Amino acid sequence: MEHTYQYSWIIPFIPLPVPILLGVGLLLFPTATKNLRRMWTFLSIFLLSIVMIFSLYLSIQQIFLSCIHQNVWSWTINNEFSFEFGYFIDPLTSIMSILITTVGILVLIYSDNYMSHDQGYLRFFAYMGFFNTSMLGLVTSSNLIQVYFFWELVGMCSYLLIGFWFTRPIAANACQKAFVTNRVGDFGLLLGILGLYWITGSFEFQDLFEIFKNLILNNRVNLLFLTLCAFLLFVGPIAKSAQFPLHVWLPDAMEGPTPISALIHAATMVAAGIFLVARLLPLFIVIPSIMYIISLIGIITVLLGATLALAQKDIKRGLAYSTMSQLGYMMLALGMGSYRSALFHLITHAYSKALLFLGSGSIIHSMEAIVGYSPDKSQNMILMGGLTKHVPITKTAFLIGTLSLCGIPPLACFWSKDEILNDSLLFSPIFAIIACSTAGLTAFYMFRIYLLTFEGHLNTFFLNYSGKKSSSFYSLSLWGKEEEKKLNKNFGLVPLLTMNNTKRASFFCNKTYKISNNVRNQIFITVENFGLNTKTFYYPHESDNTILFPMLILLLFTLFIGAIGIPFNQEGIDFDILSKLFTPSINLLHKNSQNFVDWYEFLRNATFSVSIAFFGIFIAYCLYKPFYSSLLNLTLLNSFQKMNSKRIRWEKLINFVYNWSYNRGYIDAFFKTSLIESIRRLAKQTNFFDKRIIDGITNGVGITSFFVGEVTKYIGGSRISSYLFLYLSYVLIFLMILLFFYFEKF
């Protein structure tokens, strides 16, 4: 086994040959490299598979032997300072390596088909290989300097991949936004690292934790400065894991290709922040104020992400806010000291969210044949609906991922989220109420996404169907907002579900409208009627096998990965692999890690959390079941209809919810007004001061000297005697002034 650990340093560098060879090949042999492009995909998958097998072997060794291995090489710069670099293998490293490689392999297989028609196919796989290398280097780092180096590489790769289609202005702005926002966090992280080195004199994790703990226990350091350094360290993960208030880059990151969205949201960039907090938790845990700040940021992000996802129309953006909320759960768990629960949820959420993003990519892929290649249309859930019969495999996979994220047993996220909810009850009643309420919101907005996408009929079929200006709850249900302006009659993709008469379209109407059988039985969809073009397209179709295969594998992970953390405590049954891997683990809420929850308490807590999830699903089903469906709950709608006195107040609340979600909680607007506009005004004033004042002084001196010379030249008349006379006159005047001041002193 020791022999195996000696070669662990090679883990980050195994995927690296692909981007290097691709770069050299495209530079020296561009035609041959492009012709053999499928070979590069196979090589990328093969190399990442080697890393996965290696990581699995290390994890198995750690489960049975519970060992930590560190190997460090020292680079002496002078007698007083030496830089040490190496690798650190522990259970956290093994879990993250398995997560990165398994999700990465499936995303690479998926991308081979998804990006097959893109001109940047080889560039995409070069970026992906470098992304995997950077993330593997981050999780195997043995000190903070190495962490920061690979941390920056992860940020650079995300910048390149988010802006992969850089010719689109929206994508270019999105990658710049991600880059600038993460620079704020990275600057804080760098300051925190330097501050810790000033205090402890070491960058190594093992030495750092021991020295830090001794300084706290012996009261040999300024606690305020120590807290400041720890908080600055935490600023980096706030930005990288899209925590409030540095979360603003995450929704815009959806402008990159869908496989990148899956990788960023599941196993790489956003997971990097959670990983770093987990790695530094022995340091944070001795400062109670920092632990409370971590949990506070986490619970704010949990609620904010869920509320912002409520009325999103873009399927990828809705999933992005869902990721933000789930990352908040992980950060909350770490802030509560529940190390095991946080990492358990990181694992289960990664596979579930990767499944959902790859499923959304399959949906977008099928919709592009109908509405075109504009993300505003192909990703718009309002133009979807009725995809169940067209993409049944994608629908099944997406439904499993949705149910998992909702917390429905026995799927993956149920086990991990239930642990976090239970731990929040022990930590703070207020935090527990928010966390449980958000669990219901999660079920609501996830099933909203599912119902709008798969239930009913394909909404691009309908002509002259739209919610008009009215106090309509229904117009919010699908659109999220009532239209204030009149619709253009020539534009037919916007209208969705309006009536053919002059009556207002209301969600509270108890009349159903039957859809023409001619529409259902159409073989082709003519987009001519929608005012777009005269081409004819097919129905949505199921994706190819290379897209479906990764989704099915992720579906199996979503079904069974939760088993690694099921808390069995019966005699003769000990399947809790996760606790074995994290023995001894950090947990402030359960001091005795071997004392698992008994089945009665577990079932009681699980029943409560599942009830909340089912309540959210029920509300989503009632509000978002297709308006023309015979299964629509008209009794419920009539009960709302009778509450005429409260209806206006209720609709104002709904419009507020929509505006809050649509405007991203007004946080982007606040940053734009308070920061961006202020910086622009300051830049303009600085530019004015530089050009008019600074340059004016220097240019003024030059111009003055020029004119003085010209005047002197004119007076002198170009005669040497005149120049000599002027020179002597200047000297005489200078001497007179000097003598005047000299005699003035006496």
Swiss-Prot record:
The keyword Chloroplast applies. This is NAD(P)H-quinone oxidoreductase subunit 5, chloroplastic. It comes from Olimarabidopsis pumila (Dwarf rocket). The keyword Thylakoid applies. NDH shuttles electrons from NAD(P)H:plastoquinone, via FMN and iron-sulfur (Fe-S) centers, to quinones in the photosynthetic chain and possibly in a chloroplast respiratory chain. The immediate electron acceptor for the enzyme in this species is believed to be plastoquinone. Couples the redox reaction to proton translocation, and thus conserves the redox energy in a proton gradient. NDH is composed of at least 16 different subunits, 5 of which are encoded in the nucleus. It is found in: Plastid, Chloroplast thylakoid membrane. Its EC number is 7.1.1.-.
